[in-house]
Amino acid sequence: MTGLILAAGASTRLGEAKQLLVYQGQTLLERSIRLAFSVCKEVVVCLGAEVEQTVPIIQRLKVEFPTLSYLEVGNWEKGMGESLSVGLRTIDQNKDVLVLLCDLPFLTNAHMKNIISLANSERAIVASFQGVNSPPVFIPASLRTLFNGWSGDQGLGKFWRQNPMLCEIIHFSDKFRDVDVPEDREYWGI
């Protein structure tokens, strides 16, 4: 299984690069990479807006995680769907993929392991935090073609809304709180 971290956005609502924010001694990008490697053999990071600042983080972590790589999403401004589509096309089509975002500081290795414990070849596994569906999302190789041609601001929500029979929801009691606006940064003490 390959981890795919979507970290190409410009963080316009936050006003600064969320990938570079430090939480518990690590940037949010580094934290996401470590979480992905807790269950994945290789990880690909989609970069865009902050490539000059994020590539050095990835290069430093390659010493610890030799199967870590990144790709620059040319049209990252189009939205998350563009990064998702480009990232999925880059990864071998025969591999299952775990999609993560880099702005979810509440995620733990236990969340990753619980999601992967339900992995199968026929259904996507979607995390739900107190009723809010969100990545991480496990996508089996058999469903990956459904994402071909995605672009724009089509996140994964479109997938689980249009294909409920192809998704299994794993419920967590944790509150969903990402890092999107300055108030979120204050909430997390970042």
Can you annotate each of these PLM segments?
Residues 1-133, 165-172:
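Nucleotide and nucleotide-moiety/phosphate-recognizing core
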Residues 3, 149-190:
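Conserved alpha/beta core of the MobA/IspD/sugar-nucleotide pyrophosphorylase nucleotidyltransferase superfamily
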Residues 13, 53-57, 146, 178, ...:
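Phosphate- and divalent-cation-binding pockets in alpha/beta enzyme and binding domains
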Residues 15, 30, 144-147, 183-189:
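N-terminal/domain-start segments enriched in small and hydrophobic, helix-friendly residues
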Residues 26, 94, 141-143, 182-183:
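Short loop segments at secondary-structure junctions
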Residues 111, 142-143, 175, 184:
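Short, well-ordered alpha-helical scaffold segment located
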Residues 113-161:
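Flexible, gly/pro- and Lys/Arg-enriched active-site loops
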